[in-house]
């Protein structure tokens, strides 16, 4: 999936997450996480984000994640909404997930 534009999904409310994405000129993934529960769940948050990006074959992006204690299912939903917005498609290609 190609990320064409910057986008935002989520809120800064307790129990939610705000994620910002922007395309990069390289194939790297620049991931910055700021979380109120990073000490306890930082590795799990990072793993979830990288899993979703890998499922949709996303590379060459900068992600800024401001987590306020979001559950894994919320994090995944926000990421999928973000990818749809940033790629300019109306819905994710569910059948193409790896």
UniProtKB/Swiss-Prot annotation:
Keywords: Cytoplasm, Phosphoprotein. It is found in: Cytoplasm. Covalent carrier of the coenzyme of citrate lyase. The modification O-(phosphoribosyl dephospho-coenzyme A)serine is found at residue 14. GO terms for cellular component: cytoplasm. Its main location: cytoplasm. Oligomer with a subunit composition of (alpha,beta,gamma)6. The keyword Cytoplasm applies. It holds the Pfam family ACP. NCBIfam families: citD (TIGR01608), PRK13253.1 (NF009726). InterPro entries: CitD (IPR006495), Mal_deCO2ase/Cit_lyase_ACP (IPR023439). Belongs to the CitD family. This is Citrate lyase acyl carrier protein.
